[in-house]
UniProtKB/Swiss-Prot annotation:
Gene3D superfamilies: 1.20.5.110, 3.30.60.20, Phosphatidylinositol 3-kinase Catalytic Subunit, Chain A, domain 1. Potential tumor suppressor. Seems to be involved in lymphocyte adhesion by linking RAP1A activation upon T-cell receptor or chemokine stimulation to integrin activation. Stimulates lymphocyte polarization and the patch-like distribution of ITGAL/LFA-1, resulting in an enhanced adhesion to ICAM1. Together with RAP1A may participate in regulation of microtubule growth. The association with activated RAP1A is required for directional movement of endothelial cells during wound healing. May be involved in regulation of Ras apoptotic function. Interacts directly with activated HRAS; a RASSF5-STK4/MST1 complex probably associates with activated HRAS. Interacts with KRAS. Probably interacts with Ras-like GTPases RRAS, MRAS, RAP1B, RAP2A and RALA. Interacts with RRAS2. Can self-associate. Interacts with RSSF1 isoform A. The RSSF1 isoform A-RSSF5 heterodimer probably mediates the association of RSSF1 with HRAS. Isoform 2 interacts with activated RAP1A and ITGAL/LFA-1. Binds STK4/MST1, inhibiting STK4/MST1 autoactivation. This is Ras association domain-containing protein 5.
Length: 413
């Protein structure tokens, strides 16, 4: 057998038999070829004439039995708990993304507060001006203070309070922070001024103290000395705030971009809300040797996004001596990291506490001459009232002593 030429097929290909083709004659009209039925179309929809043509006719010619129609593919059942998703056609209408500008309903798990449980009484601010816990403005003369939670406000702000009293049943319901279990408690608290007279150390002395401090530090929070003589380190501040703090409401948390660019998210809204911080919460700060108490307070308020005036708070140092806890209020110009370096890393020896500035320094330059004269008049009146009370008290003692002497003279022995 001769081999086929190059480019020709060596053997005939075995293909499926093609359906018969109908050629239109010149004399008459021939019916068009029938359409091939789809797989999923039921048998009842196929016309009899179409079924007898094409493959059906060839099957009948061979004598093969009629195959049973294959059922259409059924859709998958939807799993419980899931909604069936509908697929949009390409180019179909996309529904508009409508977002509400109105306030969403509050979480039902958050209990609504109505300012209940407070026991307000008049408070005379003799040591200096105070601060309103509701509006944040300064209180100069008369204020109202709750006997339980120490909530302080203007008399005109009393009807606007919505925060419930935290200590309705007394001071035993203080919410302790989880960190408070790590700190030993003492029975006696004595507020006493501790005077320290020390000369400023040299760079060599500071280096020796830092080496000694880092050798005793067990939590990898040592201090680092720079070439210019300054040093950096960590301090822990205990927050013992009994009065509520004011924070902005409805803002997003501070992002890394805001922290780098020093963007304050609280400045983007005028809405305010108040809440109680847990007692004895601990906050750690990384500061330098030149950081003052005023900057530490401002840094703490910025971390918690508190919008209250920094003069409302004060930083105290707490030392343990002879079984007693001694508190000393630090000046706004003191450097806490230097005190931490002198005391060592042990928090039982020295710790820092942030409290309300109840006995703040009075800025007399902020008052006018008539106001200062009014203060003098009030002080003189209070002084005279105190003198009259003491005179009346000792006059009663004198009368009782004289009566006792007269009764004893008539009795023998």
């Amino acid at each position: 057998m001769a081999s086929p030429a190059i480019g020709q097929r060596p053997y005939p290909l075995l293909l499926d038999p093609e359906p018969p083709r109908y050629l239109q004659s010149l004399g008459g009209t021939e019916p068009p070829p029938p359409a091939r039925p789809r797989r999923c179309i039921p048998t009842a929809l196929i016309s009899a004439s179409g079924a007898s043509e094409g493959r059906g006719s060839r099957r009948n010619a061979r004598g093969d039995p009629e195959p049973t129609p294959r059922d259409c593919r059924h859709a998958r059942p939807v799993r419980p708990g899931l909604q069936q998703r509908l697929r949009r056609r390409p180019g179909s209408h996309r529904p508009r993304d409508v977002r509400s500008i109105f306030e969403q309903p509050q979480d039902p798990r958050v209990l609504a507060e109505r300012g209940e449980g407070h026991r307000f009484a008049e408070l005379a601010l003799r040591g200096g001006p105070g601060w309103c816990d509701l509006c944040g403005r300064e209180v100069l003369r008369q204020a109202l203070r709750c006997a339980n939670c120490k909530f302080t406000c203007h008399p005109e702000c009393r009807s606007l309070i919505q925060l419930d009293c935290r200590q309705k049943e007394g001071p035993a319901l203080d919410r302790q922070s989880p960190e408070s279990t790590l700190t030993p408690t003492f029975n006696k608290n004595v507020c006493k001024a501790v005077e320290e007279t020390q000369h400023p150390p040299t760079i060599q002395e500071i280096k020796q103290k830092i080496d000694s401090y880092n050798s005793r530090e067990k939590h990898c929070l040592g201090m680092k000395l720079s070439e210019d003589g300054t040093y950096t380190g960590f301090i822990k501040v205990h927050l013992k705030l009994r009065r509520p703090v004011t924070v902005p409401a409805g803002i997003r948390p501070q992002s890394i971009y805001d922290a780098i660019k020093e963007v304050n998210p609280a400045a983007t809204t005028d809405k305010r809300t108040s809440f109680y911080l847990p007692l004895d919460a601990i906050k750690q700060l990384h500061i330098s040797s030149s950081t003052t108490v005023s900057e530490v307070i401002q840094g703490l308020l910025k971390k918690f996004m508190v919008v209250d005036n920094p003069q409302k708070f004060a930083l105290f140092k707490r030392i343990h001596k002879d079984g007693q806890v001694l508190f000393q209020k630090l000046s706004i110009a003191d450097c806490p990291l230097y005190l931490r370096l002198l005391a060592g890393p042990d928090t039982d020896v020295l710790s820092f506490v942030l409290k309300e500035n109840e006995t703040g320094d009075v800025e007399w330059d902020a008052f006018s001459i008539p106001e200062l004269q009014n203060f003098l008049t009030i002080l003189e009146k209070e002084e005279q009232d105190k003198i009259h009370q003491l005179q009346k008290k000792y006059n009663k003692f004198r009368q009782k002593l004289e009566e006792a002497l007269r009764e004893s003279q008539g009795k023998p022995g």
